[in-house]
Amino acid sequence: MKKTIPVVGMACSACSANIEKKLCSLAGVNSASVSLPGRSALVDFNPDVISLDKMKQEVNNIGYDLVIEADRSVDEIERRAYRLLRRKTLLSWVFALLVMAISMRWIVIGGRNMANQVSLLLALANMIYCGKSFYVTAFKQLKHATANMDSLVAMSTGISFLFSVFNTFWGESVWGSRGIEWHTYYDASVMIITFVLTGRLLEEKAKDSTASSIRQLMGLQPKTARIVQDGKIEEVPISTIEKGDILEVRAGDKIPVDGEVVSAESFMKANAAYVDESMITGEPTPSEKIQGSRVLAGTIPNQGKLRMRALQIGENTALAHIIQMVQEAQNSKAPVQRIIDKLALIFVPVVMGVSVVTFFLWWILGGNVALPHAILSAIAVLVIACPCAMGLATPTALMVGIGKAAQEKVLIKDATALERMRKVNAMVIDKTGTLTIPNKDIDFTKADNLPLEARETLKPYAQEAMQELQDDGVEIYMMSGDKEEAARYWASKAGIKHYKSKVLPQDKENLVRKLQRQGMTVAMVGDGINDTQALALSDVSIAIGRGTDVAMDVAQVTLMGDDLRAIPKAIQLSRRTVSMIKQNLFWAFIYNVVCIPMAAGALYLFGISFQITPMWASALMAFSSVSVVLNSLRLKFMA
């Protein structure tokens, strides 16, 4: 059984990696994939061996929460969490500005001791209320011998606070008596928390935008429906609808479930209504619905009203399947992300080790100010290290890319398919049902006596789509069961150079193998059962949404409508997404490689007296993760 479960409390890639590791270690869990930007876990498990409650308990033990209760609204939980984060961030800025004002002597409170004690109280209040989650999560991580971003924040702020407390009460007697100048660093501990919270607030806002495609799809689901019982019409929650119920849907209403039309009427036609299905199929023209027609949840009658019998409800509707497919795709991981996840598990412990080495080097080599400088350098290293930027680099770009594809009416099943599409340079395409639409009004027993144009029609924009693909360097091979003359005619009509007539299903499979042996990355586009072998064999398999269920089950990519221009769009989107991932990873890697040594004071080795302070380290760390998300969001606005 596969299930997408919302996760609350993740802050960095180490968080998602720890949750994934914990879930995969549980008996009964076959596999788990946790998405940081998606705030969810895709879990394949055996419900006879392990329950959702058990998984929730195990994840809660390491500091996170799985939302499995049906009565808990994920959206409401996330809204509450965001409001709390915003409140803590604003209050933390108040504490930070007060402590900074006291530190800079903009506010004068008695003598030095009094000022330090007031700063102590303000910093402590900030840690207890605004920074509490860092310490709680870090403690839970410590109990399970793991670490994440919260561990780094808790260590850095805890050390700077405790060192400041020591100096507040014993600084003069320990350091002053030896002629060593001493300071407190409450401003550093407060500003670290403030900048990290600010970064997370901005990051949450930005990550929220990466999930907009899912919210748009979920927005197609109405909350209520009109049920017809005993001649009366009553509005009821959609969750109470059962199979076989008769529902009334009026113009402008969203159809609540999948079903069959019982009766329809409109001013244009007495026994028909017209339904806008563009949000599902991409078709701009409303579809005529008469008695016996199938209707889909989320579509909208824009002319007339209809009564329908509910056939598929809840998670079994076509819309629910689309949402589930997009969620699973966004939770899937590209091969490079698997490597990043492994790095994330060791990144934080390595940073802690670098921080300890930095401390001892400065303590040994720092002269009179050895200890204070060693502590500040160690804190700066802890704060500036950012597993978030590396962890967000791939999944945010994938989420936006897969979401953008869904908006273009292209469903991509997993990250591997999206990544592989950019390499496609050969495409095998079935003719009937894919390039052409059979004419439903003809007698096919007499079809041989009819002109080719009368038997079937080239799909709108098919020629344009084929031209775009060929201009992009993709060689297209049309496969047809027709005679040579008919195959040549339709290939010419679509603008395709390579074609083959009188093909059998194994011929398609053989052509795919032949092209692959020539070193080409092959996409197969089909819609029928006879295409499934070739679809399964191809590097990228593309099915037409109006095709058979078997073809769509095998395919990695599904076109929800008949517009073949979606294929070149998807290939271009794949290239842009992979390019964005490379950009994100490059800058995240460069950030850590450059900034960690600068925070440790490496520039002193080259005679440059510059070092990143803990406060600036926290600001840079916050900016690095936000910038990765914002860079990925650029995909949404690319044509």
Which residues does each PLM region occupy?
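Actuator/coupling domain of P-type ATPases
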Residues: E58-E76, Q117-S119, A123-T224, E242, ...
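Conserved cytosolic catalytic loops of P-type ATPases
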Residues: T4, L26-V49, D53, H183-Y186, ...
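Flexible metal-binding regulatory segments at protein termini and peripheral loops
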Residues: M1-N116, Q216, K232-I233, A270, ...
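Conserved catalytic phosphorylation-site environment of P-type ATPases
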Residues: I280, L376, C386-P451, A534, ...
